[in-house]
């Protein structure tokens, strides 16, 4: 007759073969503890599943962070509060954004403030938090548009595939938005197309800029219509202003 220890060892081996090492280790540890016989069936199942589940969740979040180019970022929304060095306006806006309801609702966020005011910190903190539930990408706007133009020139098929992925992406973050003047008509068209498609699909986009939206049109040369359309979509919902006290 097979003993409890022999059966446990067999189950541990089978769980490892199934690619469930955390569950296997937990079963082995529980069986050798005094608590094993005191656990009811559901409690035992719960204790076996929890470590494996948490490991899978952690790996999924890390994969999302890596894809978003946010892996290893220390930024946290807990740090994005009013202080002596900076103020977030309107009042209470960081608490609203921390809920991430805007991602679910497909709303856009425009983060404004001078250089080193904390725009990137806030955007990355939102991105890191969003990766727990959503697919995110973080890009510097200028290099992002250059890469999209280059991809289109190399392979239109891959470019189209990337556009479709961007259209379905839960949250797109474009940092340093219009930091320099866009003179390439192809970049203007791509930026407009992405914002337009994402608005139609009700997907959230965050842009961070040192410049007031009223000056954006002058940063997009030779296409006033597209410039106005881009501004309208990027500032459609929430606008966050960061006042950095040390910059005033």
Question: Which stretches of residues belong to each language-model region?
Answer:
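Short glycine-rich substrate-engagement loop in P-loop NTPases that contacts/grips substrate
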Residues: 86-94, 131, 137-167
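Walker A/P-loop nucleotide-binding motif
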Residues: 105-122
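N-terminal pre-Walker A segment at the start of P-loop NTPase domains
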Residues: 74-100
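Charged, compositionally biased N-terminal leader segments and the immediate start
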Residues: 1-18, 24
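Interdomain "pre-motor" coupling segment immediately N-terminal to P-loop NTPase/helicase cores
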Residues: 20-72
């Amino acid at each position: 007759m097979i003993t409890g220890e022999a059966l446990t060892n067999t189950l541990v081996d089978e769980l490892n073969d199934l690619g469930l090492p955390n569950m296997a280790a937990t079963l082995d540890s529980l069986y050798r503890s005094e608590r094993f016989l005191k656990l009811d069936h559901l409690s035992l199942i719960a204790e076996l599943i929890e470590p494996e589940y948490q490991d899978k969740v952690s790996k999924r979040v890390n994969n999302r962070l890596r894809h978003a180019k946010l892996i290893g970022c220390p930024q946290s929304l807990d740090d994005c509060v009013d202080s002596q060095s900076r103020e977030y306006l309107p009042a209470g806006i960081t608490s609203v954004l921390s809920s991430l309801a805007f991602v679910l609702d497909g709303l856009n966020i425009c983060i404004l403030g001078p250089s080193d005011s904390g725009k990137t910190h806030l955007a990355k903190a939102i991105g890191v938090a969003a990766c727990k539930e959503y697919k995110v990408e973080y890009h510097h706007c200028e290099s992002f548009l250059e890469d999209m133009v280059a991809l289109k020139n190399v392979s239109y098929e891959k470019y189209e595939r990337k556009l479709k992925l961007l259209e379905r992406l839960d949250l797109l973050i474009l940092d340093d938005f219009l930091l320099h003047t866009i003179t390439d008509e192809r970049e203007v068209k791509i930026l407009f197309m992405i914002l337009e498609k994402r608005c139609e699909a009700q997907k959230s986009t965050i842009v961070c800029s040192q410049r007031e939206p009223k000056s954006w049109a002058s940063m997009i040369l030779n296409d006033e219509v597209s410039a106005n359309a881009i501004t309208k979509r990027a500032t459609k919902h929430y606008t966050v202003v960061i006042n950095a006290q040390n910059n005033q």
